[in-house]
Amino acid sequence: MIVPIELAHTKNITYDITIDALPQLTFDTKVAVVTNPTVAGYHLQTLLAHIKAPQLEVITVPDGEEYKTLETVETILNELFEHKFDRKSLLIAFGGGVIGDMTGFTASLYQRGIDFIQIPTTLLSQVDASVGGKTGVNNRYGKNLIGAFYQPKAVYIDPAFLKTLPSREFSAGVAEIIKMAVMFDKDYFEFLVTADLSDEEVLKETIRRSVELKAWVVNQDEKEAGIRAVLNYGHTFGHVVENETGYTTYLHGEAVAIGMVMANALAVELGLLGETEADRIKALLEKASLPTHYTIKDVDDFYEHFFLDKKSANNSIKFILPEGIGGHKIVSDIDESVVKNVLKKFEEEV
């Protein structure tokens, strides 16, 4: 199954997202696989058996969001220099969203840009992070504040890699699936309410529908000038949760789930979402074993973090909110007191 990326406003950038068993990959240039010890332990030998290249290197970096930094990117760059990679060389991102983001960003920097491909191994990266060309790293001010839009040459999604994924990581990926359904497709939401994702065929169908939705958005708006910003539902709040907890307490998808609950509370306050709809979304998140509670220690500090969000501009915060299930609205003129009153509801767990 192939989902095409054909960027509407960018000349000559097209590539395929292949959802199937990993094919044999043959290259006529130097190739470096960037991965982490966890993925390497389970799947590296399988990947290497599928690659033919005149020179093949493996670069292993530490596992975890806390290592998604400029320092780690510099480590990868130095390895490429050590192995005398050139502008025709290729990187392969083999791992989850952290590996994909850092590998893509490294590819954008090395000698002003070399090719890379994505082979995602987590549900979150298969349905979301590997699709669309967002790359980057975190710093002490916030998440993904340093980065670039840099498209891969191809994406290969093999659901078989998910068989070794811990249940918590799997749930984190489901958060991004629910996000897309709430924003764009009520029928898909209803499908997810009853879907058994432990069934391989149901899971493959879920991956397909999610990738098609993401590709549909990216094809219209590569650089988040419009509709692509809607994919940040849950992220404005979720990124603050991640930052406040040092990127070590919650997986990204878990923080997004909490952020969705917070965004829903604001949407209910503004009359965009009914209480019953908010409860249904929360129930679906809980069905996926995702956290839906977070205690805000200081509402003022939490609010100030919003201004470090990439979507904020001219001292205005853009909130991505559901307008019913299957609809969305971007709102940037909400009075500070309204937002803070909603945040106060999370000073004690709801």
Curated annotation (Swiss-Prot):
Gene Ontology terms, MF aspect: 3-dehydroquinate synthase activity; metal ion binding; nucleotide binding
> Which CDD domains does the record match to this protein?
DHQS (cd08195)
> One biological-process term from Gene Ontology?
aromatic amino acid family biosynthetic process
* Binding positions (NAD(+)): 63-68, 97-101, 121-122, 134, 143, 161-164
Q: What is its main location?
A: cytoplasm
Which reaction is the catalytic activity of this chain?
Answer: 7-phospho-2-dehydro-3-deoxy-D-arabino-heptonate = 3-dehydroquinate + phosphate
How many cofactor units bind, and how? Binds 1 divalent metal cation per subunit. Can use either Co(2+) or Zn(2+).
The record's subcellular location field reads: Cytoplasm
Q: Which cofactor does it need?
A: Co(2+); Zn(2+); NAD(+)
Give the residues the record marks as binding Zn(2+): 176, 235, 252
Quote the cellular component terms of the Gene Ontology held in the record.
Answer: cytoplasm
Report the EC number(s), separated by commas if there are several.
4.2.3.4
Pathway info: Metabolic intermediate biosynthesis; chorismate biosynthesis; chorismate from D-erythrose 4-phosphate and phosphoenolpyruvate: step 2/7
Record Gene3D superfamilies: 3.40.50.1970, Dehydroquinate synthase-like - alpha domain
Q: What class of enzyme is it?
A: lyase
Which keywords accompany this UniProt record? Amino-acid biosynthesis, Aromatic amino acid biosynthesis, Cobalt, Cytoplasm, Lyase, Metal-binding, NAD, Nucleotide-binding, Zinc
Question: What function is annotated for this protein?
Answer: Catalyzes the conversion of 3-deoxy-D-arabino-heptulosonate 7-phosphate (DAHP) to dehydroquinate (DHQ).
PANTHER family from the xrefs?
Answer: 3-DEHYDROQUINATE SYNTHASE (PTHR43622), 3-DEHYDROQUINATE SYNTHASE, CHLOROPLASTIC (PTHR43622:SF7)
NCBIfam families documented for this protein: aroB
UniProt record similarity statement: Belongs to the sugar phosphate cyclases superfamily. Dehydroquinate synthase family.
Q: Which HAMAP family match?
A: DHQ_synthase
- Provide the protein name: 3-dehydroquinate synthase
